[in-house]
Amino acid sequence: MRRLSSQLMCTAAAVRFASAGGAKKYDLFGYEVDTNTAPWIEKVKKCRYYDEAGEVLVSMNVKNCPPDLETYNATLQKIFEAPSKQEKPVENESKFCAMMDLMEEMQHRNKVKPNEESWTWVMKECVQSGQFRLGYCVAKLMEAEFKRVPEDLVKQNEANAAKAKADGKEHPSTLAQQQSLFDIKIQ
């Protein structure tokens, strides 16, 4: 009897989850997952500051609607386009760090692999902020992952590097202030 009842329970659960025909998804606990991210993407696009966009992602998770690649890309775009993290800018805020934090959440928490568009937003931020060293790293990653890098962004990054070299800011000022190991006299 126990075997029969356990088979019936398993079959009933399998039928419940399979009856969706692939349209419905269920989480680990058997709750239905909402896959309609379109209204959430619109909310992200309406945000003025990128901290608000992060709150939209939190709300999505609370409502059992995990963000997909399109939602993450819209959030990366919002981080790039927003004037600041909050209405009153936060000291030492970094859009690049915010983007990398979001990419980490994408890959490791939600198992969503960033695509070329995702990394293009990061590269655009490197170019816009003048961080040409980070731009080199992102370009190398894009070349390895996608076999191409947006040529216009590479040229703009090279222009940033050339400008920094011409201004004498090719290397961070802290390196220029450090004393060489060979210049130290030990007595």
From Swiss-Prot:
Predominant location category: mitochondrion
Gene3D superfamilies, sorted: Tetratricopeptide repeat domain
Record has Membrane as a keyword: yes
Span of chain positions assigned to the transit peptide in the UniProt entry: 1-17
Cross-referenced InterPro entries: TPR-like_helical_dom_sf
GO cellular component terms attached to this protein's record: mitochondrial inner membrane
Domain of life, source organism: Eukaryota
Protein keywords: Membrane, Mitochondrion, Mitochondrion inner membrane, NAD, Oxidoreductase, RNA-binding, Transit peptide
Full protein name: Protein P18, mitochondrial
